[in-house]
Amino acid sequence: MPEGPEIRRAADNLEAAIKGKPLTDVWFAFPQLKSYQSRLIGQHVTHVETRGKALLTHFSNDLTLYSHNQLYGVWRVVDTGEEPQTTRVLRVKLQTADKTILLYSASDIEMLTPEQLTTHPFLQRVGPDVLDPNLTPEVVKERLLSPRFRNRQFAGLLLDQAFLAGLGNYLRVEILWQVGLTGNHKAKDLNAAQLDALAHALLDIPRLSYATRGQVDENKYHGALFRFKVFHRDGEPCERCGGIIEKTTLSSRPFYWCPGCQH
């Protein structure tokens, strides 16, 4: 399943295609959304927001399309008039004069008013998004030490969207490797330096992944570009200590770590 950085890049692609352009055609598959089709013609998308793995497509008439891709949903951008050859089931079409965005296969789709945005069950449950530029390490540290989270093992906590939205399995293992901790550690047991390092890594690594993952290091950025240090690298030597990276299962998900320097 895509994690926060991949969801944010998808949102960027949608914004680049249709943001600010009048909608010339709107179509929804679900009957409960049909009445919104005519209300959105002539309106435009103001911005696309991510809340963890959910997308909020905001329109100029203050309505917001909530969509969660879950396992199978996918957005595509096409030239207007193009009909992709696919076996997926179309759920949403938002068309402008030159570009159209299409949502396939998702089942969790709703239209929300500003009031409903503040009471939506999923949006109420999720924590701050790690890619929110206004989220600071100080706020993350406060959440780590809060009564709700301080006694939780990181193996489960870093997958819990109520703690921080947008984290997932590859980010979980890369963050813990970066700070030299295991999945069994808890925030209440860390010293001040460890807490500070973890709070920064919880933001820095997702943001680096969002900004640079998939780019080729052609200009020799000396490690600044995101790349996996332990994820899917079991059996390989750890670049930090030379120990052998191992794979186990924690919180029902594959977990990669180096016993030599994560303890």
UniProtKB/Swiss-Prot annotation:
Swiss-Prot/TrEMBL cofactor(s): Zn(2+)
Keyword annotations of the record: DNA damage, DNA repair, DNA-binding, Glycosidase, Hydrolase, Lyase, Metal-binding, Multifunctional enzyme, Zinc, Zinc-finger
EC number: 3.2.2.-, 4.2.99.18
Catalytic activities: 2'-deoxyribonucleotide-(2'-deoxyribose 5'-phosphate)-2'-deoxyribonucleotide-DNA = a 3'-end 2'-deoxyribonucleotide-(2,3-dehydro-2,3-deoxyribose 5'-phosphate)-DNA + a 5'-end 5'-phospho-2'-deoxyribonucleoside-DNA + H(+)
Zinc finger residue ranges, FPG-type: 229-263
One BP annotation, GO: base-excision repair
Cofactor note: Binds 1 zinc ion per subunit.
Membrane-spanning ranges: none
Superkingdom, natural source: Bacteria
InterPro entries assigned: DNA_glyclase/AP_lyase_DNA-bd, DNA_glyclase_Znf_dom_DNA_BS, EcNei-like_N, Endonuclease-VIII, FPG_cat, MutM-like_N-ter, Ribosomal_uS13-like_H2TH, Znf_DNA_glyclase/AP_lyase
A single GO molecular function term of this UniProt record: class I DNA-(apurinic or apyrimidinic site) endonuclease activity
Binding site for DNA: Q70, R125, N169
Role, per record: Involved in base excision repair of DNA damaged by oxidation or by mutagenic agents. Acts as a DNA glycosylase that recognizes and removes damaged bases. Has a preference for oxidized pyrimidines, such as thymine glycol, 5,6-dihydrouracil and 5,6-dihydrothymine. Has AP (apurinic/apyrimidinic) lyase activity and introduces nicks in the DNA strand. Cleaves the DNA backbone by beta-delta elimination to generate a single-strand break at the site of the removed base with both 3'- and 5'-phosphates.
PANTHER family, A to Z: ENDONUCLEASE 8
Family, per entry: Belongs to the FPG family.
HAMAP family referenced in this protein's UniProt entry, alphabetically: Endonuclease_8
Protein name: Endonuclease 8
Naturally occurring in which organism (per UniProt): Escherichia coli O6:H1 (strain CFT073 / ATCC 700928 / UPEC)
The gene coding this protein: nei
